Swiss-Prot record:
Localization: Cytoplasm; Nucleus
Function: Is involved in NO detoxification in an aerobic process, termed nitric oxide dioxygenase (NOD) reaction that utilizes O(2) and NAD(P)H to convert NO to nitrate, which protects the fungus from various noxious nitrogen compounds. Therefore, plays a central role in the inducible response to nitrosative stress.
Protein name (record): Flavohemoprotein
Binding site residues for NADP(+): 301-306
Site (described: Influences the redox potential of the prosthetic heme and FAD groups): 113, 420
Disulfide bonds: none
Domain notes: Consists of two distinct domains; a N-terminal heme-containing oxygen-binding domain and a C-terminal reductase domain with binding sites for FAD and NAD(P)H.
Pfam families: FAD_binding_6, Globin, NAD_binding_1
Organism (species): Schizosaccharomyces pombe (strain 972 / ATCC 24843)
Record-annotated site: Involved in heme-bound ligand stabilization and O-O bond activation: 58
One GO term describing the cellular component: cytosol
Keywords: Cytoplasm, Detoxification, FAD, Flavoprotein, Heme, Iron, Metal-binding, NAD, NADP, Nucleus, Oxidoreductase
């Protein structure tokens, strides 16, 4: 290692330690009324120009702090979905500055997201510095006064402290922190554009622990041609096999997707990746109260992955499952063999209805109770028995919005529909 590389590494370590010290300095400071008014005065600006502000913030942060690059998907910056969700968060924080309790559910989602990505306390000062300096640079000088910036500095410090403490509690309960090296042990094509990747610890002495059905892991990839490592989240697509000491994820090829195309075209058995501990609250729930209650499951496309262990576990528990599965077409539908085996084993307890949006004709298979060559619609949902069932749903955002909206119209309480969103999402 050259002296330049050593100096750079020492500088990186010193910077990380400095950020960690800053993070430890966060404490809750009650905002006075004058400071709250400064935060409220931000509302019109955030409503009209919030995305422009957060877009500039991300450009500043990602351009000056390479250590945070792995945590962000470039596609989400290009589509502005990441800036939009931050603008949404800032706006609602300002609107609720007098009482943040109404944001508790949203903040819980942030904690889950951060833990899944293994966000650390030392990242918060970076975000705070870039956010405040972006405000100072972009907002008019008569708005971004020292008092205005001080109010936002205090408000951000309060938010950071809440999130850091909440995330710390979750980290303490996890079997490991950070990313452990795992080796690709097997690759299986599940359909024309879905590939399953089996991952086992590089160190055979390292034992994986139980994961709740429905949880996901973050995988740290090193892609040739990229200047930095990059993270992606994947649901565990089977019941975790602790005996074989491995996880399974399943990756759909996305047009233009850097990571998904690498997985499909270049990933090999023996390759090494970093894997986080399982995380997420979209999990199978078992209790004395619901032991005899049926499950109603909706999956759109690759959204089937977390439902595989959820459905399997429910059937093993003796519960009935009504499964509505939507795919683009027959050749892209993954896990055909799994569906066949499950249907043959649980003939009476598993009802399977499939929807293919791109096919004019599909031969009904023995395993399928009903096939539709169209997208799921209101009439399909009206025919379902919605009384006393646990509802699980995962798929594209628009798909989930539609299904949940229609279920609510039919009398289902919104909080009864369990779902999860990957990537930036505005509730």
């Amino acid at each position: 290692m050259s002296s330049v590389e050593v100096n750079r590494e020492n500088a990186d370590v010193a910077n990380t330690n400095r950020q960690a010290n800053l993070a430890e300095g966060y404490e809750i400071k009650e905002l006075n009324e004058s400071q709250k008014q400064y935060i409220r005065s931000s509302i019109p600006i955030l409503e009209s120009s919030g995305v422009n502000l957060t877009k500039a913030f991300y450009q500043k942060m990602l351009g000056n702090y390479p250590e945070v690059l792995p945590y962000f998907n470039k596609a989400h910056q290009i589509s502005l979905s990441q800036p939009r969700i931050l603008a949404f968060a800032l706006l609602n924080y300002a609107k609720n500055i007098d009482d943040l309790t109404s944001l508790s559910a949203f903040m819980d989602q942030i904690v889950v997201k951060h833990v899944g990505l293994q966000i650390k306390a030392e990242h918060y000062p970076i975000v705070g510095h870039c956010l405040l300096s972006t405000m100072q640079e972009l907002l008019p000088s008569d708005v971004a006064t020292p008092a205005f910036l001080e109010a936002w500095t205090t408000a951000y410090g309060n938010l950071a402290k809440i999130l850091i403490d909440s995330e710390k509690k979750v980290y303490q309960s996890q079997p490991w922190n950070g990313f452990v090296e795992f080796k690709v042990t097997e690759l299986i094509n599940e359909s024309s554009d879905v590939k399953s990747v089996y991952l086992g610890p590089k160190d055979p002495a390292f034992r994986i622990s139980h994961a709740h059905p429905g949880q996901y892991v973050s995988v740290l990839w090193e892609i040739p041609g990229l200047s930095h490592k990059t993270l992606r989240e994947y649901s565990l697509s089977n019941r975790v096999d602790t005996c074989r000491n491995q996880f399974r994820i399943s990756v759909r090829r996305v047009a233009g997707g850097v990571v998904s195309n690498f997985v499909h075209d270049n990933l090999k058995v023996g390759d090494i990746v970093g894997v986080s501990p399982p995380a997420g609250n979209f999990v199978y729930k078992r209790s004395e109260e619901n032991v005899n209650r049926p499950l109603l499951c909706f999956a759109g496309g690759i959204g089937i992955t977390p439902l595989i262990p959820i459905i399997e576990t429910a059937l093993l528990d003796g519960r009935k499952v009504n499964f509505c599965y939507s795919s683009r077409n027959y050749v892209s539908r993954p896990f055909k063999q799994w569906l066949e085996q499950l249907k043959l084993k649980y003939k009476e307890n598993l009802k399977l209805k499939e929807f293919f949006s791109e096919e004019s004709s599909v031969t009904k298979e023995q395993i399928v109770d009903e096939v539709m060559t169209r997208i799921i619609n209101e009439e399909d949902l009206e025919k379902l028995d919605l009384s006393e069932c646990d509802i699980y749903m995962l798929g594209p955002n628009n798909y989930m919005r539609f299904v949940k909206q229609e279920l609510v119209k039919l009398g289902v309480e919104p909080n009864k529909v369990q779902s999860e969103f990957f990537g930036p999402y505005i509730p």
